[in-house]
Amino acid sequence: MIKFAKIIIDRKNNEYRNLHFLPEVFSLMLKYERFMFDDYFQANDIVKALFDMVEASGRFFWAIVDSETNELMGFAYFDNFIGNFQNLHSAEINTCFARKYWGSQVRFVAKKFIKYCFKNYGFKKIKATVFRENLMVKGLLRSLGFKKEALLKGETIKNNKLQDVEIYSITRREKCKQKKLI
């Protein structure tokens, strides 16, 4: 089925885990960066930017792996935390999956991952920020029970144009109401 392999880069404590997935994570990030980043994402050294992103996520960066083939399906990480690491209130989820897994496989994995995060980390709320034109991700979020919370008009610049951003979220309480989750 699937496994969530935590990727850790902790230079301060000299701890590194599952770095063998980083070349594939890097490849996915480059392939789909137009869906992930705005014009303010300035990375002269994209490899260093990935390492910094993994390290900044504070142990909340995962390779999502097909456990039968050990093939990378995608990755997920959290940022913009509210609370502290002993008492997490909310965070923003970011994901990217290889195209061959888009559709029902991503939906299955996403459902498992959201359940895993609520159960194991005690989040009260998980948020997602989506570029307005990313219809596929918005549909996925809605199918998982996320609700649109806000439209931030002209929130950023993408392709030298003002870009609207939508915020979606789901709370632990809402997730508990869904029969087979948590």
Predicted regions and their residues:
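Active-site rim helix/loop that mediates acceptor-substrate recognition in acyltransferases
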Residues: D39-R59
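Short, polar/flexible loop-turn hinges at active-site or ligand-entry regions and domain interfaces
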Residues: R34-F37, K100-Y101
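Acyl-donor (CoA/ACP) binding surface of acyl/acetyltransferases
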Residues: M1-M29, F61-I182
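Short, N-terminal intrinsically disordered low-complexity segments that are rich in Pro/Gly
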Residues: N14-E15, M36-D39
